[in-house]
UniProtKB/Swiss-Prot annotation:
Subunit structure comment from the entry: Monomer.
GO biological process: cellular response to calcium ion; cellular response to corticosteroid stimulus; cellular response to follicle-stimulating hormone stimulus; cellular response to forskolin; cellular response to gonadotropin-releasing hormone; cellular response to jasmonic acid stimulus; cellular response to prolactin; cellular response to prostaglandin D stimulus
UniProt xrefs under SUPFAM superfamilies: NAD(P)-linked oxidoreductase
Post-translational modification: The N-terminus is blocked.
Name by which UniProt lists this protein: Aldo-keto reductase family 1 member C18
Protein source organism: Rattus norvegicus (Rat)
Length: 323
């Protein structure tokens, strides 16, 4: 099946499909599900798959991709696969081994995009969130410019076609962009972005610097108890959004996704439900009028569903700045 998903050019000459399939699964029993849903996503036309070492399901996602290559649904070059460097591997000597470890699990020769997942560095080791005896995270101090140099080497070695960052604020992006001897610019910054956190200032800054903004959490959140405040409003229940959905005869989710695409944002969407996975591709079947875009712009309330407060003590915590 030919994918109707449009692509956006990156600053290094590669291009990224503007709609991506997210694979984050919180619990072990969902990892199997993430494999099945990734197969479905590829079958219905998704070509951009977003994963990470942190999600602990790269093996399953790799199996899904390889099985779809083996059955002739896609070729490797049809798939745009993103992986991410976790915070316990920021030290330069750990960057390439971490990527190679992901590639082994995936059974792939390269990733299309490799991101620094979060700007906060943690103590190296097997524990994803290393803690001391009091339950506090054990932080590490690494210059992100040194990490970036190691990322550049991964690109030069052909292990990653493109490299970028995630959850960086403007100041942190500037630090990389102004690094002496910078060889490769970040192609993107993947951040939480939705109607209640529309990231308009960060988006403007990224566009000015030819960096693509990639949105996660574009539909709000699946309300994981461990990481969000349950008192936060449910984005897809927003009355203005629901009224607009009726006007366009679409679901609130499709309006929320279309809003991002109209702004030139690459958007990730995650579902384990086959019907919804198919439905999400309908985002290319309509457009929003400019006055409706303005109405949606005004829903912004600077609300983070993923505040990542456990990292607040680190000097590189990204969300204390305005953007």
């Amino acid at each position: 099946m030919n994918s109707k998903i449009q692509k956006m050019e990156l600053n290094d000459g590669h291009s990224i499909p503007v709609l991506g399939f997210g694979t984050y699964a919180t619990e072990e029993n969902l990892r199997k599900k993430s494999m099945e849903s990734t197969k479905i996503a590829i079958d219905v036309g998704f070509r951009h798959i977003d994963c990470s070492h942190l999600y602990q399901n790269e093996e399953e996602i790799g199996q899904a991709i390889v099985s779809k290559i083996e059955d002739g649904t896609v070729k490797r070059e049809d798939i745009f696969y993103t992986s991410k460097l976790w915070s316990t591997s920021h030290r330069p000597e750990l960057v390439r081994p971490s990527l190679e470890n992901s590639l082994r699990k995936l059974n792939l020769d390269y990733v299309d995009l490799y991101l620094i997942h979060f700007p906060v560095s943690l103590k190296p080791g097997d524990e994803l969130l290393p803690q001391d005896e009091h339950g506090n995270l054990i932080l590490d101090t690494v210059d992100l410019c040194d990490t970036w140099e190691a990322m550049e080497k991964c690109k030069d070695a052909g292990l990653a076609k493109s490299i970028g960052v995630s959850n960086f604020n403007r100041r942190q992006l500037e630090k990389i962009l102004n690094k002496p001897g910078l060889k490769h610019r970040p192609v993107c910054n993947q951040v939480e972005c939705h109607l209640y956190l529309n990231q308009s200032k960060l988006l403007a800054y990224c566009k000015m610097n030819d960096i693509v903004l990639v949105a996660y959490g574009a539909l709000g959140t699946q309300r994981y108890k461990y990481c969000i405040n349950e008192d936060t409003p449910v984005l897809l229940d927003d009355p203005i959004l629901c009224t607009m959905a009726k006007k366009y005869k679409r679901t609130p989710a499709l309006i929320a996704l279309r809003y991002q695409l109209e702004r030139g944002i690459v958007t990730l969407v995650k579902s384990f439900n086959e019907e919804r996975i198919r439905e999400n591709l309908q985002v290319f079947d309509f457009q929003l009028a400019s006055d409706d875009m303005e109405i949606l712009d005004n829903l912004d309330r600077n609300l983070r569903y993923f505040p990542a407060n456990m990292f607040k003590a680190h000097p590189n915590f990204p969300f204390s700045d305005e953007y």
